[in-house]
Amino acid sequence: MRHFHSRSAASSMTALVLVLGLGLATSARGQTASGDGVTIITGDATRAAFAKGTPLIETAAYKVHASRREGPGTAEVHARDIDIFYVLEGSATLVTGGRPVDAKTTAPDEVRAPSIEGGTSRAVAKGDVVIIHNGVPHWFKEVRGSFLYYTVKVPTAASATAGGSRIDRP
């Protein structure tokens, strides 16, 4: 298995640490707030979210989803959001780059398509962190078994799209 990230992974991982470590200071189901800017999403709430594949928290500054797939997904392109995935369970084939086939705009700055033509296929599995910058088409083409992963969405300026690189695990 390989671990992939972009050239600006340090800033994206910093965003992930800030989002998860400095507190999720908004109101959502299964959270407790201590009044000091720290929010805890309980284990029960997290497990329930993963059972259905639903968001844990969504704010204007970031979103954290408990993502679940049992089969292939839809190709996506986000004009503004960086996606950071952390795979908890399962494995999948992730296609990035290329051209979305029969793409449709589904929301402002969001495009969906049934597939991607000409992209790069990569195997991802438990423990992998994947950072996909805004503007990069991506698609979970094949999913083996239950595929559970955290998704952290960090909005950024559309001009912040960066190239990617690969880091192999030791």
Placement of each model-derived feature along the sequence:
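Bacterial N-terminal signal peptides
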Residues: 11-25
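Short, conserved beta-strand element in jelly-roll/cupin
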Residues: 79-100, 106-115
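A short hydrophobic beta-strand segment most commonly corresponding to one strand
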Residues: 145-163
